[in-house]
Amino acid sequence: MGARASVLTGSKLDAWERIRLRPGSKKAYRLKHLVWASRELERYACNPGLLETAEGTEQLLQQLEPALKTGSEDLKSLWNAIAVLWCVHNRFDIRDTQQAIQKLKEVMASRKSAEAAKEETSPRQTSQNYPIVTNAQGQMVHQAISPRTLNAWVKAVEEKAFNPEIIPMFMALSEGAVPYDINTMLNAIGGHQGALQVLKEVINEEAAEWDRTHPPAMGPLPPGQIREPTGSDIAGTTSTQQEQIIWTTRGANSIPVGDIYRKWIVLGLNKMVKMYSPVSILDIRQGPKEPFRDYVDRFYKTLRAEQATQEVKNWMTETLLVQNSNPDCKQILKALGPEATLEEMMVACQGVGGPTHKAKILAEAMASAQQDLKGGYTAVFMQRGQNPNRKGPIKCFNCGKEGHIAKNCRAPRKRGCWKCGQEGHQMKDCKNGRQANFFREVLASGGHEARQLCAETSVPISPTNGGGSEGTRESESEGGSGRAVPICLPQIPLWDRPIVTAKVGGHLCEALLDTGADDTVLNNIQLEGRWTPKMIGGIGGFIKVKEYNNVTVEVQGKEVQGTVLVGPTPVNILGRNILTGLGCTLNFPISPIAPVPVKLKPGMDGPKVKQWPLSREKIEALTAICQEMEQEGKISRIGPENPYNTPIFAIKKKDSTKWRKLVDFRELNKRTQDFWEVQLGIPHPGGLKQRQSVTVLDVGDAYFSCPLDPDFRKYTAFTIPSVNNETPGVRYQYNVLPQGWKGSPAIFQSSMTKILDPFRKSNPEVEIYQYIDDLYVGSDLPLAEHRKRVELLREHLYQWGFTTPDKKHQKEPPFLWMGYELHPDKWTVQPIQLPDKEVWTVNDIQKLVGKLNWASQIYQGIRVKELCKLIRGTKSLTEVVPLSKEAELELEENREKLKEPVHGVYYQPDKDLWVSIQKHGEGQWTYQVYQDEHKNLKTGKYARQKASHTNDIRQLAEVVQKVSQEAIVIWGKLPKFRLPVTRETWETWWAEYWQATWIPEWEFVSTPPLIKLWYQLETEPIVGAETFYVDGAANRNTKLGKAGYVTEQGKQNIIKLEETTNQKAELMAVLIALQDSKEQVNIVTDSQYVLGIISSQPTQSDSPIVQQIIEELTKKERVYLTWVPAHKGIGGNEKIDKLVSKDIRRVLFLEGIDQAQEDHEKYHSNWRALASDFGLPPIVAKEIIASCPKCHIKGEATHGQVDYSPEIWQMDCTHLEGKIIIVAVHVASDFIEAEVIPAETGQETAYFLLKLAARWPVKVIHTDNGPNFTSAAMKAACWWTGIQHEFGIPYNPQSQGVVEAMNKELKSIIQQVRDQAEHLKTAVQMAVFVHNFKRKGGIGGYTAGERLIDILASQIQTTELQKQILKINNFRVYYRDSRDPIWKGPAQLLWKGEGAVVIQDKGDIKVVPRRKAKIIRDYGKQMAGTDSMANRQTESESMEQPGEIP
């Protein structure tokens, strides 16, 4: 107050106090009126220091005078007071305010007349930018426009693109210009022909109107008189520069052609602005969460584009600005009154309607203001004082509730003064001091210490209410002992506008710290030194400022030099150029949690996926979202040094016009290390204990509250593109856990667990269930105490950066939690409504099944088997599916069950768990978990797993195992079971198969329907029963086969089969034996496949043959089934093997087959090892693998394996750079043929196939079902070349897996060599060459080309070897030993060499010299010996393996 009172001293103060307020009034001016005037000037952003001098008061009067006509009474009173003060400074003798105003008017009138007289005598200056000056001869000449001005104009047009800002920019740059200069400016932007055409039309219209209103004089002109300008003369098309100068400067009859032309240009610019900015001022409305400042910016930007008079624009400002604001801001603006200034509006609405993160950040910063620093405090840098001793939680002044502040309050706003908080007056009428405790009933920082930002810094910035000291203060506790306090950097909270006192060039002033401003702009400050004029843009338009360089700015003892702009700004601003020098940072307290270190998978680099194009509205939405996230500290801008990128896109939120940002992290997820999920499932309400008090909380912005590892952030980079590549994309990276990234759930769960552990330990009576951001808090405490503990939990989370919004804070039942509805003594699932549709799609059925599965955990008897049958196979989501009668019945049954609400109860630890299981037929089961009868904790259902052959007891064991695992997870212990099976039935089955599955203890109850075994296999041969030796064989190529049996009594039955496989034939042989046998039978088979199926005692099967076998088994009294190894000389087995193999399969005989088979039976080695160790051709080795029952036991077809026969190729089309590449891959070698084709047609595909067949032997081509592959041209090419064309899934569910993998490999190589080739077709052939001949690996360590040649050569050798062996088999050998003169034989010829032969005689292989052997042809006589290789048959040829020799 002393500073303001020092405006007048001594005699001047005495004179001031003698002046009356009104004529004849007793009240006189006092010192308090000076204090009041100083404060009012600050409200109007004027310098109160100017009141100290006469010149200063005169400047204030000139500044305020234009606003008197529309100003408030307070403004008029202020102007009157300054006028009186001006008279006091000038020593004028006045008695009251009226005389002071009269004196002021007289002095000002005399000055104006003197200036007018001086102007008449001085030469006319029409412009400062383009002056028309007088030369040495006294002639008026024109000074040409400068290149710098033209450059500024062109740059403005290119940057602003005819936005509303271009009009004041044109007016500023063209001030004083003549039409010649203006046309020069327009010619400089000739690239915008569309806009200039619009401007030309406006000029023509205005010129025509000028000619109509200013007709030319009739007759010739007098000598020496210049003609009057026409419309085209004003436009500069038919006039010269000299004529334009004369018209402008010819005294009283001057015509300012330049100003007239400028008005026409402005009219055209207005039209262009309206065209380029079609948004109407009526459409500018403030969003529900949009900051008021951003809304004002958009409002005035659009207002400048409106073609209206200034009076209309003033009306729009007074009414629409308030009318179109959001409800929160509108209520505050209306409370300010109709005459509130824009500054008052922006001050009042600061933080209102903005993102809720502001309140969270500020509350977090203030709540921890005195908590983390033990034994110390942080001097908080604020505009107004605060109470460091205030205790207690944050409390809202507006609604009185704890947990938030008034600026973030959603309750209706209190009316009242924005200074003192009292109702009955507004801020402009406040007499109660500068700042009261409005919105600060309880400061957020009261009772807490701020987090320690650094170890040591300078002294505190501003004293607290108790006074400041050099880094220490006395304790205010009862002891009163002083303590040392660690010194910390100053913090400037954002509860209010961050205004500080700064010394600029030696002058003290208050300025706003504005991180959104580039420059520092001050008003009414006199700086020394040279300055340059400059124009900057602000809220109200462009303003002219003076630019001073190297000005010293001091803030709280720290100095920095920088550029300062001085001009008529409404608020003094310290911009980023000064704040950066001071070392200021904008800190958003995301979380004090230590980041979890994350790495990429070994050998992998970050994603480098290009951003795909986005529409303009999506780019604008993403820009706004990212700007807000950047302000919150969630993301940061990055430069071009980061080589990684992940594409982003935007979608509209459901039932909303707002946009949501999505990041496609699929590529990053592939490359990121794997995480262990710390939580393997969601909590179940059946496992909750019944609690007296319950609360459900939700953590707001859960992932965004956890920091991301700084070393990993670079991999999350993404780019926001610009429309038409106008500017480079804006690059960002995440500072927090991103949504959609694979590591976010695990890291957040782990971090949240660590945060909750201290609270759990200190509050053991409180039970907290945590799943992601949902928290269930239960206790048996009284409700009031329970809620206190919940508030402590919320505060605990808040200190770590996690908020729990009031909107999702559930205090009263029913509680909605994790999809469940919790009541005090029961729970249920949230209401489920099944849709009633006439037309069902696959997607509808999927959603329906999901709802029913969710309901089955409390509703008993829910069945979905028939519904699931409708969507089997690969179908489109939109494909229409007709409901079967069974599915309709099942759906209606489920509807009936869901009509009546069903509830579950809570867990009681002192009681046992029980489970009841029921069978519903067709492999469907239901179960209930309970402690008391008819009070279920949980229910569920089970459907038979994917198994071709099973029985009820096996399914029952699976149900029990499933329920047991659930019980261990939910309740931590095993329940007791009540099962629908008799003890005898179970023990009979379980005695042999106990090792198959783990089963807990149970009780056997007689609750129908009971489960029983329909047949039983004997463990020992049945004495007196007939024995059937069964076998089957099939030819892979012809699909023909035989199946049958022989008995020890000589009875036999052989049937022929068509379109069969070896496994089907084996099963058919068992079926024939069962059909032809009596009530008791022994069956012997050499097929492990058959033994495995029947010995499991299935009661149902998906295979028709197995189902028939089951039916036959149920008719028998006793059945014994055993297995014997094939081809081991077992009589009956060998006999039936010969019978079914005749004319079906042939066997290749080579040395080492027996040893290889025995070795494989021991170790089950692969065919490569057999071929290498025993010298067998690959085909023979593969046949041995195919004949192994343990290596092929799971089905009739070798699913999951690709056919690697030498003549099989896969073909597919892929796309790159908008072109089509057709690729053919040799499956066995990975050799590639590829080229670019002009179109994906059948003709081009067939032509490529012909070229492929001309180069390489192709027997089979495998493709997908694309139209180019199924075309008539492709069929014709396959027919002509004799190539078998296969579609679909012949051997592998992903039958195109080889060519798809090669497509990826080929594209990868193309990217590596792309910069070496001009055209894509060249790059494709280069990549094919690299793949085929420059990269080794895989089988044999060859290149793909070498491997292909080796395979083809091996195929030829194998074929020739087969011919040679078959030829040799037609000869027999008689031989003799060296010591025995008797000829032995005949033996089998295995090999004939130049000096010796290799023979096999009675199982022994011998090498006999050529001279001691006689070779004769076999003419069909049956050779003796049961072990002769000629009579031995193997099952191997019937197996479906590649490379079989027919």
Swiss-Prot record:
Gene that specifies this protein: gag-pol
Segments for region (Interaction with Gp41): 7-31
Annotated segments matching region RT 'primer grip': 815-823
Residue numbers covered by motif Tryptophan repeat motif: 986-1002
Ranges for region Interaction with human PPIA/CYPA and NUP153: 187-225
Region (Interaction with host AP3D1): 12-19
Domain named Reverse transcriptase: residues: 632-822
Site, Cleavage: residue positions: 130-131, 362-363, 381-382, 437-438, 444-445, 488-489, 587-588, 1028-1029, 1148-1149
PROSITE patterns: ASP_PROT_RETROV, ASP_PROTEASE, INTEGRASE, INTEGRASE_DBD, RNASE_H_1, RT_POL, ZF_CCHC, ZF_INTEGRASE
Residue ranges for the DNA-binding region feature of this UniProt entry: 1371-1418
Keyword annotations: Activation of host caspases by virus, AIDS, Aspartyl protease, Capsid protein, DNA integration, DNA recombination, DNA-binding, DNA-directed DNA polymerase, Endonuclease, Eukaryotic host gene expression shutoff by virus, Eukaryotic host translation shutoff by virus, Host cell membrane, Host cytoplasm, Host endosome, Host gene expression shutoff by virus, Host membrane, Host nucleus, Host-virus interaction, Hydrolase, Lipid-binding, Lipoprotein, Magnesium, Membrane, Metal-binding, Modulation of host cell apoptosis by virus, Multifunctional enzyme, Myristate, Nuclease, Nucleotidyltransferase, Phosphoprotein, Protease, Repeat, RNA-binding, RNA-directed DNA polymerase, Transferase, Viral genome integration, Viral nucleoprotein, Viral penetration into host nucleus, Viral release from host cell, Virion, Virion maturation, Virus entry into host cell, Zinc, Zinc-finger
Protein name as catalogued: Gag-Pol polyprotein
